[in-house]
Amino acid sequence: GKIVDIDTPADLFRQLVDKHFDGDLDSVVHLYYKNLLRMVELGGFDIVGHADKMHYNASCYRPGLLDEPWYDALVRKYFTAIAEYGYIVEINTKSYHDLGTFYPNKRYFSFLKELGIRVQVNSDAHYPERINNGRAEALAALKKAGFTSVAEWHNGKWEEREIE
């Protein structure tokens, strides 16, 4: 098969799904999570980022995808695999002020806590002026979900830093 970049704005995502997958969103979502599970198995990294950005991209097809049980089951299976391998999950805040969402969506924060997954908060470095976008809100949401600390890179290693 060919590589199709789906980390795009929703309108371009729709065009790519229509062109390369005949508009079959369900197949794209299942293939996406299948490949993410394979990535987790192969490893070679510390952090898993943009853990459920698919819900945003796919919103151009089905705005309620995040609420569909089959989608939720895929995301939970993915997080369970992440927990088994001991990776850190990035809580990405870049789009919080524009779109009102984190990646992963905050509805999964309690599940991450339940699984014992460590989390790390960042906003990407694509836009330096957005480096702290949504950080305070993400930390507050994590605290509400039961987290007391987040992972941060200091002096060449991951350390837990208390959420104040």
Place the predicted regions along the sequence by residue:
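Charged catalytic cores and adjacent phosphate/nucleic-acid-binding surfaces used
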Residues: 5-6, 61-164
